[in-house]
Regions:
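Asp-based, Mg2+/Mn2+-dependent phosphohydrolase catalytic module
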Residues: 1-4, 113-114, 118-206
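Active-site neighborhood of HAD-like aspartate-dependent phosphohydrolases
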Residues: 2-42, 178-179
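Generic structural signal for small/hydrophobic residues in well-ordered secondary structure
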Residues: 10-13, 53, 98, 108, ...
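Alpha-helical elements of Rossmann-like donor-binding domains used by nucleotide-donor carbohydrate transfer enzymes
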Residues: 23, 27, 45, 59, ...
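Short, surface-exposed acidic
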Residues: 32-43, 69-80, 201-206
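A metal-dependent, Asp-based hydrolase signature
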Residues: 48-78
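Short, acidic loop-to-helix structural element flanking the phosphoryl-transfer center
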Residues: 66, 75-107, 118, 146, ...
Length: 206
């Protein structure tokens, strides 16, 4: 078995809450008294471009929410979106301990829109943990498409067999495995620690 050199981490559902998922959108509908079917239909049409960084947050909101007059301001809705992001303290603590060992290259590999991604990087000090951010909004590619994994491997110059992808969604992991990457489906920190150890990743002190 090839020795592990690089850990790729999903963000939402692993170290943080999801940035703008179905639960967040349902809460927005409830909070701002929106029509779910209309909003969700517009969201689905804009999602690919939004997460690939092809449109800005303001345009996404103009197309999905503010295509007509509302009783609330754009800034109020933006603030709601950003406030939805919250940390998983145990995950961040474990991530920090691994990063401080400096035994492995650590990188984010996530789907996220530009403004929410950069808010999360800044708010939760993710530069302290990750050396690189292979985010959909920067690469203009999304998981589970094979190209985003291939691009990350080429940029890092890593062999798939020496990399582990940690993600909470099985489909994302399936596609990575097809390229030869090792994978762990995240459920909790204790389970992650055990599975990393099985791959030979040193987690001493964690």
């Amino acid at each position: 078995m090839a020795e592990v050199s690089t850990l790729f981490w999903d963000n939402g559902g692993v170290i943080l809450t999801n940035g703008w998922d179905r639960d967040a959108r349902k809460k927005a509908v409830e909070t701002f008294h929106l029509d779910w079917a209309d909003f969700e239909d517009r969201h689905e049409l804009m999602l690919d471009a939004f997460e690939k960084g092809e449109i800005a947050l303001d345009e996404y909101l103009r197309r999905t929410i503010f295509y007509r007059e509302r009783a609330f301001a754009v800034e109020e809705f933006r603030e709601f979106m950003f406030d939805w992001s919250q940390p998983f303290p145990e995950s961040l603590d474990f991530l920090g301990r691994l990063a401080r060992q400096r035994k492995y290259a650590m990188a984010a590999l996530n789907n996220e829109s530009l403004e929410i991604n950069e808010y999360r990087i800044q708010k939760f000090h993710l530069r302290d943990y990750f050396e690189a951010f292979f985010s959909s909004c920067y690469l203009r590619l999304r998981k589970p498409g094979a190209e985003i994994y291939t691009k990350a491997l080429k940029i890092t110059q890593c062999e798939p067999s020496e990399c582990i992808l940690i993600d909470d969604r099985e489909l994302n992991l399936e596609c990575a495995r097809e390229l030869g990457m090792k994978t762990i489906q995240f459920k909790n920190v204790a389970q992650l620690r055990d599975e990393l150890k099985r791959f030979g990743v040193a987690t001493d002190g964690n």
